[in-house]
């Protein structure tokens, strides 16, 4: 199998963390309230601006929505035990690596630093004030389309084509990467969901874990 780059999702792929809800929990805020805000936004009961204001308010209410505290949270989150060795083995073979996540830019940067990956893209940009307090964020609702745009930026920056790459992920927002590369490796989540039919159909391979990905791309 010939390829020049591998594009990884983060949540549920390189890490067991579900970053949005786990971040809320780590701050000490109500996960139930977070889920209600997201539900109301998804069902269009509230606008994007209203959902953002409510979620930022929820996080700020803990008194812990501050850059240094958030960085400690992200530093402490676990990686899949296979991830460091997998990334190391790809780097030794001069395979380029890119992280594209629907999560936060601060978290994506942290994972990139821990794994030694310089190319990373995130769907959510945190906005801090001069004192490091989290004030807002920018978020793109259509994560699959946004991931594809970010993938295209990576290709341009790396002088690659989509078919030079493998894509590894575990959720619906990876579907456009699977379609673009034609070689999407789908990691089955621990708990089944009702929104995975499309991504399963688009996948080139289905695997139970990151360890199985390691076996495929480093035979």
Where are these regions (language model features)?
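Acidic, Mg2+-coordinating phosphoryl-transfer loop and its flanking beta/alpha structural elements
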Residues: 101-102, 162-208
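Short, acidic loop-to-helix structural element flanking the phosphoryl-transfer center
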Residues: 68-105
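Substrate-recognition "cap/lid" segment bordering the active-site pocket of phosphatases
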Residues: 109-165
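Short acidic-hydrophobic, aromatic-tinged amphipathic segments that line or gate anion-handling sites
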Residues: 120-121, 204-213
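Active-site neighborhood of HAD-like aspartate-dependent phosphohydrolases
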Residues: 1-49, 53
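Glycine-rich phosphate-binding "P-loop"
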Residues: 63-77, 134-142
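Surface-exposed amphipathic alpha-helices with a cationic face
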Residues: 84-92, 147-148, 152-159, 179
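Short, charged, surface-exposed secondary-structure boundary motifs
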Residues: 128-135, 194-204, 216-219
